[in-house]
Amino acid sequence: MLDYDEVTAFLGEWGTFQRLIFFLLSASIIPNGFTGLSAVFLTAIPEHRCRIPDTVNLSSAWRNHSIPMETKDGPEVPQKCRRYRLATIANFSELGLEPGRDVDLEQLEQENCLDGWEYDKDIFLSTIVTEWDLVCKDDWKAPLTTSFFYVGVLLGSFISGQLSDRFGRKNILFLTMAMHTGFSFIQVFSVNFEMFTLLYTLVGMGHISNYVAAFVLGTEMLSKSVRIIFATLGVCIFFAFGFMVLPLFAYFIREWRRLLLAITLPGVLCGALWWFIPESPRWLISQGRIKEAEVIIRKAAKINGIVAPSTIFDPSETNKLQDDSSKKPQSHHIYDLVRTPNIRILTIMSIILWLTISVGYFGLSLDTPNLNGNIYVNCFLLAAVEVPAYVLAWLLLQHVSRRYSMAGSLFLGGSVLLLVQLVPSDLHYLSTTLVMVGKFGITSAYSMVYVYTAELYPTVVRNMGVGVSSTASRLGSILSPYFVYLGAYDRRLPYILMGSLTILTAIITLFFPESSGVSLPETIDEMQKVKKLKQRQSLSKKGSPKESKGNVSRTSRTSEPKGF
C-alpha cells in the first residue's frame, strides 16, 4: 500500500519549499514566547509599604518611623502590610515626643494599610499588582491570574486537536492565532482584576491551540528526517527566542498596559503568513479533497525547481492514502490505561514525571523576580539557557538511552536546586547560576519527555497515554505559580520543594522501561514491563494463563508537541 511520504518523495527533503514551511511555522511560535511567560513582568510585585497620607500631620521623624520593622533574610526591612496606628502617632507628634527616645515603638498599636500602599518604581512603573493593590490580604490573586492562564492552556489542549481535525490545520492555526492576539489586545483595556483574569484564560486557550496547530501542520508537511528536527528543535528554539526578547521589551516599557500592547502587536504581523503557509495536503486527502492537495504539492515542486509527475495521486489508490487517523479503529477507552498492573504503574509514573517537570520548568521561569540581580538579565538568561538544553536533548535522543537521559537531566536539575539553599547570602551570582543550571536540566527533560512517553505506550492507546500525561503537565503549570508564591515566606522554600520533587522523579524514571532501539509496541500485551515487575510477572505466568491479546487495530504512531 502506498503512503503519503512515498508519493511525495520526489519533492526532496530540504528544498526551498520545506525551508519556507520550517521557518515560517517556527516563526509563528515567537509571539507565544512573549505571552507564555509575560506574567513574569505583568504580575510582578514591587517593593511596597503602607501609604501615609500627606494630610496626616506628622513630624518628619514620625513619618520616617510610621512603618514597623521586621527581620527578613537577615537585615531589617519595613513591614509591607502593617503600620503604626496613625491617630496614635499623630497625637505623639503633636505633643513633640520623639520616636525611639520618648516612645517605645515596640509597644505601639499597629493597623492594616487603610489608605493603600506606596510602591517602589525603580524597576516597574506599574503592574497589575500596583494598579489593583494585589498585595497583603489579596496577594493570592496575582498567582491565581497566572494559574488561570494555564487553565486556559489546559482547556485549549482539549479542543485544539479536535478543531484542527474537523476544520483544517491552517484554518485553526490562524483562527486561534487571531484569538490569541485579539484577546491579548482587549486585555490591555482591563478595568479590574476579574476582567484581566478572564481574558488571560482565553489568551491561554489561543496560545496553546495555535502552537499545537503549527506543530501538527509542520509535522504533516515535512519529510520524516526534517520533522524530527522541527518537532524537537524548530518550534522550541523559536519559542525560546520569543522568551529571550520578552525582557528586552519589558526593560524599555515598564508600564504593564503598554508592555502588553507591545508584545501583542507582533501577533498581528503573523497574520501575513496566511498567504505563504498552505493547508496540510495530508488533511485534505483525509477529507477527500485530492485535487486541492495536488495543487499544493505541484506548487511545492515548482518552488523547489522540480517537475512533478503527470499523475501524483492515482485515483485507484486514493483511499489507501488516507491518514490512519481517518480509519475507525476498534474502540479503546481511558480505562485501558489502568487495565493491567504494568500499564497502570506506567501511567501513574508518567503522570508524576510530567507533573514534576512542568512544575519545575514553569516554576523556575515564573520565579525570575525573586532571583538576586537584575530581573531583565535573569529573565534573558533563563530563556537563553533553553537553547543549549534543546540541542543537548536532541543529541541525547540520538545517541544515549532514553531512561538514563531523562534521569540524568532530572538529577542535574534537582541537585543544583537543592544546593541553592547552601549558598551564602552574599554569593548572589552563585545561587543565580545554580538556578540557571537547574532550568537547563529540567528543560532538557521537558524536551525529551514527549518522545519517551510516546514510545512507551502501545499504538492502540498511545494518544490517550500521552494525552493523560500532557494533562498532568498542564496541572503542574497551574500549580507552579503557588510554588513561587511560597517564596514570600522563605525564598529557599520553592527551590527545596522543586529540587526534592525533581530528584524523587529522577529516581522513579530509572524504573521506566528502555525504549531506545526497541520497536514501538502495537498492543498492550506487547508493552515492555516496568522494572521490578518483570520478575514478578514472569513468575506469575507460570501459574496463570496468558492475557488474551484480543482484537486490536493499529493506529498511527503519533507524538505531540511540548506544550507551553
From Swiss-Prot:
Which compartment or compartments is the protein found in?
Answer: Peroxisome membrane
Per UniProt, what is the membrane topology? Multi-pass membrane protein
According to UniProt, the name of this protein is Solute carrier family 22 member 21
Question: GO MF annotations for this entry?
Answer: ATP binding; carnitine transmembrane transporter activity
Give me the glycosylation sites of this protein: 57, 64, 91
What are the TM regions of this chain, as residue ranges?
21-41, 143-163, 173-193, 198-218, 233-253, 258-278, 345-365, 377-397, 410-430, 434-454, 466-486, 492-512
The chain's Extracellular topological domains, given as residue ranges, are 42-142, 194-197, 254-257, 366-376, 431-433, 487-491
Q: Which family does it belong to?
A: Belongs to the major facilitator (TC 2.A.1) superfamily. Organic cation transporter (TC 2.A.1.19) family.
Main location as per UniProt: membrane
Where is ATP annotated to bind? 218-225
Taxonomy of the source species: Eukaryota, Metazoa, Chordata, Craniata, Vertebrata
